[in-house]
From Swiss-Prot:
This is 26S proteasome non-ATPase regulatory subunit 8. The gene is PSMD8. It comes from Homo sapiens (Human). One of its GO terms (biological process) is proteasome-mediated ubiquitin-dependent protein catabolic process. Residues 1-24 are annotated as: Disordered. The lineage of its organism: Eukaryota, Metazoa, Chordata, Craniata, Vertebrata. InterPro entries: 26S_Psome_Rpn12, CSN8_PSD8_EIF3K, PCI_dom.
Length: 350
């Protein structure tokens, strides 16, 4: 006899279990007559539990793969501190590889550039540009500074001026803002002097003096790396171009040659422009001396670059570039009339 309503639970002896597709299925007894209940199955819930379990294993395997890519054996739940330590350790290892290649007698510049590119990506994880909201350890700051210093020197060897300017803009933070927290770098004054020479070679005199004001007076007067560009700026203001050319012989470091050559080329162009205006013709040997060339071949190459033609008498002629006589005639009659009229008006005022 059945009672209307929910189907009663079947006795244990009447339950049946079946295994289909490796999943356990529990089947309820037939519903009671007139009952509105439906047989229920546990197959869906079992599937959901197994899916959740397999999904958790998949997520764990993904974490382990990501950790392996980052250089770790597995994943850890110790928090951001452990992650930062792992990144710092990886950056230190990559820096040692870069340093080893850079300190070779003839470093591979392409390989160094690739290492610098990878290191900058790693440094981004460490917030290598300090801000007010970040707290970096002394080890992290020194590591980032050393990498940027190699990058600045690498840019000089590659003759990449924009890259050098970017590296110096980043290094100034470590040289000035953190000078109390960090020990002084052995390359600080050399790179700051290079930056001054760079600004001078680009004729950015205002920025040159702005950077100079950030340095102590003692360094300006005594440090050999800073004194050199300061002396060059004084020679340029005096018009003593011969002293500028002589200064190339006593550069404080080999890296200064790159910007010195740019500065000397600019000065030569200015002198050559004045020669074209002031001389109708000039002797080959005299032009070589005025333009501070030490070999005739360099003078010949520069003359071809300027479009100068050497005549049979060993003279460079600039007659075609001189102003025409009518263009240089002084209107003396008109000037005299204006002066007389001006004097007459002064007498009327008195």
């Amino acid at each position: 006899m059945f009672i209307k309503g929910r189907a009663p639970r079947a006795p244990p002896r009447e339950r049946r279990r079946a295994t289909r597709g490796g999943l356990r299925q529990v089947v309820a007894p037939p519903r009671a007559l007139g009952s509105t209940s439906r047989p229920h199955f546990r197959r869906a819930s079992v599937c959901r539990r197994r899916c959740r379990k397999s999904g958790g294993l998949l997520a764990a395997s993904r974490k382990m793969a990501a950790a392996a890519v980052n250089g770790a054996a597995g994943f850890s739940s110790s928090g951001p501190a452990a992650t930062s330590g792992a990144v710092l350790q990886a950056a230190t290892g990559m820096y040692e590889q870069l340093k080893g290649e850079w300190n070779r007698k003839s470093p591979n510049l392409s390989k160094c550039g690739e290492e610098l590119g990878r290191l900058k990506l790693v440094l981004l994880e460490l917030n290598f540009l300090p801000t007010t909201g970040t707290k970096l350890t002394k080890q992290q700051l020194i590591l980032a500074r050393d990498i940027l210093e190699i990058g600045a020197q690498w840019s000089i060897l590659r003759k990449d001026i924009p890259s050098f300017e970017r590296y110096m803009a980043q290094l100034k933070c470590y040289y000035f803002d953190y000078k109390e927290q960090l020990p002084e770098s052995a390359y600080m004054h050399q790179l700051l002097g290079l930056n001054l020479l760079f600004l001078l070679s680009q004729n950015r005199v205002a920025e040159f003096h702005t950077e100079l004001e950030r340095l102590p007076a003692k360094d300006i007067q005594t440090n050999v790396y800073i004194k050199h560009p300061v002396s060059l700026e004084q020679y340029l203001m005096e018009g003593s171009y011969n002293k500028v050319f002589l200064a190339k012989g006593n550069i404080p470091a080999e890296s200064y040659t790159f910007f010195i050559d740019i500065l000397l080329d600019t000065i030569r162009d200015e002198i050559a422009g004045c020669i074209e205006k002031a001389y109708e013709k000039i002797l080959f040997t005299e032009a070589t001396r005025i333009l501070f060339f030490n070999t005739p071949k360099k003078m010949t190459d520069y003359a071809k670059k300027r479009g100068w033609v050497l005549g049979p008498n060993n003279y460079y002629s600039f007659a075609s570039q001189q102003q025409k006589p009518e263009d240089t005639t002084i209107p003396s009659t008109e000037l005299a009339k204006q002066v007389i009229e001006y004097a007459r008006q002064l007498e009327m005022i008195v």
